[in-house]
Regions:
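Acidic-aromatic/histidine active-site loop/patch
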Residues: 1, 130, 135, 210-214
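Phosphate-binding loop that captures ATP/GTP phosphates
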Residues: 2-54
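Phosphate-binding/switch loop-helix module in NTP-utilizing enzymes
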Residues: 48, 54-99
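Conserved beta-strand segments of the P-loop GTPase G domain that flank and frequently precede/overlap
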Residues: 57-58, 89-90, 112-116, 144-149
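Inter-motif core of Ras-like GTPase G domains
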Residues: 82, 98-118
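Beta-strand-loop-alpha "switch" segments that mediate conformational coupling across diverse proteins
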Residues: 90, 149-151, 155-193
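NTP-binding/hydrolysis catalytic cores, primarily Walker-type P-loop NTPases
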Residues: 185-214
């Protein structure tokens, strides 16, 4: 079983990538943590897509999502690890928010997403530097960079340069080719992605699993 948790403190949109089957959020899990005593009960809080990925949504109210802190995340993660073999956390860009501390302390590895432009790659590289400077150097070494080609016609020479840069800093780099379904920012149907996109996703998933600590 695999669960994706949206812990983005800036109003996450992860749940918008699957067809919602539950209107409950991480806040509901925190409120009712004591009563969630089985996988069946926890399943009421998640949405499951056709690939059998379970997604736990964040709050749509930015004020509530901002208030989701490290203590709340630990409550959710403690419950999730009872019922799932792998827990993925979408933490957005709020790297100094308190929830990030709990996420990073529990993580076995990181996936850093970078766009194909120089500016986007610079921001991703600065994130790696921040992590190294704040005691997470081992996590950086075990990280995978997903080089996301969000716009059609990105220069391959530029992508080669960006990929080579990240290869000096992290364990692996995966290129995710342009795909209109990903670019649309709506519900993602894995079987309708381009074949090259599906293969990139499989490669990324395999690399993440390879990096898990026993």
């Amino acid at each position: 079983r695999v669960l994706a948790i949206d812990a983005n403190p800036d109003r996450g949109t992860l749940a918008e990538r699957v067809e919602l089957k539950s209107d409950r959020t991480v806040r509901d899990v925190v409120k009712r943590a004591g009563g969630i005593t089985s996988f069946t009960l926890f399943s009421d809080y998640v949405s499951r897509d056709k690939s059998r990925l379970d997604v736990l949504a964040s709050d749509t109210d930015p004020m509530l999502s901002e208030a989701f802190d490290e203590g709340d995340y630990n409550v959710v993660a403690d419950i999730a690890t009872r019922y799932y073999s792998i827990c993925l956390t979408d933490c957005g860009t709020g790297i100094v928010h308190s929830v990030m501390r709990a996420i990073l302390q529990r993580a076995d590895g990181l996936v850093i997403v970078s766009g194909g432009s120089v500016d986007e790659a610079k921001l991703a590289s600065e994130t790696l530097t921040w992590l190294e400077s704040n005691g997470y150097g081992d996590l950086v070494k075990n990280s995978v960079v997903a080089l996301n080609t969000a716009t059609y016609g990105t220069q391959l020479v530029k992508l080669d340069e960006i990929e080579n840069h990240f290869k000096t800093r992290v364990r692996a780099v995966v290129r995710v080719p342009y795909d209109p379904m990903l670019a649309a920012g709506a519900v993602i149907q894995f079987d309708k992605l381009h074949p090259a996109t599906r293969q990139a996703a499989r490669d990324l998933a395999a690399l993440v699993v390879d990096g898990l600590v026993d």
